[in-house]
Amino acid sequence: MAEEKKLKLSNTVLPSESMKVVAESMGIAQIQEETCQLLTDEVSYRIKEIAQDALKFMHMGKRQKLTTSDIDYALKLKNVEPLYGFHAQEFIPFRFASGGGRELYFYEEKEVDLSDIINTPLPRVPLDVCLKAHWLSIEGCQPAIPENPPPAPKEQQKAEATEPLKSAKPGQEEDGPLKGKGQGATTADGKGKEKKAPPLLEGAPLRLKPRSIHELSVEQQLYYKEITEACVGSCEAKRAEALQSIATDPGLYQMLPRFSTFISEGVRVNVVQNNLALLIYLMRMVKALMDNPTLYLEKYVHELIPAVMTCIVSRQLCLRPDVDNHWALRDFAARLVAQICKHFSTTTNNIQSRITKTFTKSWVDEKTPWTTRYGSIAGLAELGHDVIKTLILPRLQQEGERIRSVLDGPVLSNIDRIGADHVQSLLLKHCAPVLAKLRPPPDNQDAYRAEFGSLGPLLCSQVVKARAQAALQAQQVNRTTLTITQPRPTLTLSQAPQPGPRTPGLLKVPGSIALPVQTLVSARAAAPPQPSPPPTKFIVMSSSSSAPSTQQVLSLSTSAPGSGSTTTSPVTTTVPSVQPIVKLVSTATTAPPSTAPSGPGSVQKYIVVSLPPTGEGKGGPTSHPSPVPPPASSPSPLSGSALCGGKQEAGDSPPPAPGTPKANGSQPNSGSPQPAP
């Protein structure tokens, strides 16, 4: 029994050949047999020890099967790093097989059908590995590119520019809590009395916000150089690209001080030199900076506002004021000032009130030249209707007398005459819309002359034009549109008188032609109900021949009720070679059908006809077109479209003669159709 137990124990020792294989894998070629035997015994002992400890963990876990976690715990118990990567949710499905005195454990694999593998579609080719580099930082400055975090938003820039400086409390770091006791802390002395701690800000030094140093990288300096040279250069294409870059680039926050200084100094130098072109370019740069949604210019308006106002009220901006158009620069700069006031004026800085005071002071001064007077009025007018109502309208009479004395008096200077004329046009342009809203109609020239002096009649005419334009715009916005479509009609028409009778022709409309749209607009209100002739029937014709246009004579017939006589009025029209579509557009008030059964707008028919080429469509059978549905509203007499060639009002043409066929193709009772006289 002892020998059998010995033999059984000896089977658990690892073979020495395994030690040789491990040694050869490590680069040790020659190893003695005794060394291999000693290593084998040591490794076998360590494995048995770990297995015994793992069994202890298994028994403590009240489990019947040994797991890899038990082996890991045993290794940790021996201060040995555990093995990684051998964990599985289920037990490894090894199968046991024995035969020929040998025991074998193997992994059972599924049988795979080769046809399934062949018919399986190939997987998609994976993308190649590619590397893309971008600048994380350039000399300490982070470029504004999509790969990097976005720069400071506009709201943060506004907060930094408008928030007052805050003093830090002593004993408190920038982001840390108080080191000492708080303001509400109390201390008790030996007598039990409580004493309040001294206030924290008492005698504490103020920590001011450090000055920010705008250091530009080499790339930013190069960008600044290229942008400024392009903005004031002679190439308009480069200037447009540079202004577009300024208006859209999100990474210009660090360059704002340079741009504002460049604009301010550029205006100061070029005003002295009377360089109008460069002043215009600099104002366009200001406009581009203000259009950039990522920039907040609050900290730089103290440099931009004087530069822009200089271009408005400066006495002379160009070398030849009587020839050069410096008035456009003043208007553009005035709009820029209004935009600055709209965006940055608050109750704290009072930008708009200060600018208004400056403009008013220069305008009221009697010695102010006409160029400065023009700029002051333009700047005030661009600030809104309230400023015009409060500051400009009360001084129109005095300004009108000043303008009249220059325009009607002796010629002293051509520059003054041109300036007075521009000031007069500017006042009429900006004051007329305000007066149209303030004063109720009708507009009387005598009343305007009494209130506004010599400018009264001109203002009255401008107000009348403003009212008409506003009414026309409201009419175009509120108009009702009705589009009429119908199938292919066939229509018999009587042509112009020719020698000998003519048989009526059959006219067809092709269906596969690009159709232009014709719009008929009615702007007259519905007339009161009264007896009137039947409604006029308009005929719009187009030719399908290859000729560019064709002239046709159409008979528009009307008849008076009870007269028994009809009159035909020929109308010559020039029509294009494509079929039109008629759109009925009306803004007139529709009268109820019961109140005006026979009015001019009760029934209207609009017929669209296309003529085939010469020699076609003759001798065909006569058929009547399906009636066109009347429009939703009853429009008054319509203004003719481009095809009708004029205006035709209901009841204006004489009644048709007896026996004349009607325009819609219906035949009279007297017999065959007769040619129109």
Curated annotation (Swiss-Prot):
Keywords: Apoptosis, Disease variant, Intellectual disability, Isopeptide bond, Methylation, Nucleus, Phosphoprotein, Transcription, Transcription regulation, Ubl conjugation. Disulfide bonds: none annotated. Residues 663-677 have a biased composition (Polar residues). The modification Phosphotyrosine is found at residue 253. Residues 624-634 have a biased composition (Pro residues). Residues 554-574 have a biased composition (Low complexity). GO terms for biological process: apoptotic process; DNA-templated transcription initiation; mRNA transcription by RNA polymerase II; negative regulation of cell cycle; negative regulation of cell population proliferation; positive regulation of apoptotic process; positive regulation of DNA-templated transcription; positive regulation of intrinsic apoptotic signaling pathway. Residues 142-204, 524-574, 611-677 are annotated as: Disordered. There is a cross-link at residue 196 (Glycyl lysine isopeptide (Lys-Gly) (interchain with G-Cter in SUMO2)). It comes from the Eukaryota. The keyword Transcription applies. One of its GO terms (molecular function) is transcription coactivator activity. Pfam families: TAF, TAF6_C. The modification Phosphothreonine is found at residues 120, 248, 660. Its main location: nucleus. The modification Phosphoserine is found at residues 264, 626, 634, 636, 653. The keyword Transcription applies. Belongs to the TAF6 family. The TFIID basal transcription factor complex plays a major role in the initiation of RNA polymerase II (Pol II)-dependent transcription. TFIID recognizes and binds promoters with or without a TATA box via its subunit TBP, a TATA-box-binding protein, and promotes assembly of the pre-initiation complex (PIC). The TFIID complex consists of TBP and TBP-associated factors (TAFs), including TAF1, TAF2, TAF3, TAF4, TAF5, TAF6, TAF7, TAF8, TAF9, TAF10, TAF11, TAF12 and TAF13. The TFIID complex structure can be divided into 3 modules TFIID-A, TFIID-B, and TFIID-C. This is Transcription initiation factor TFIID subunit 6. The gene is TAF6.
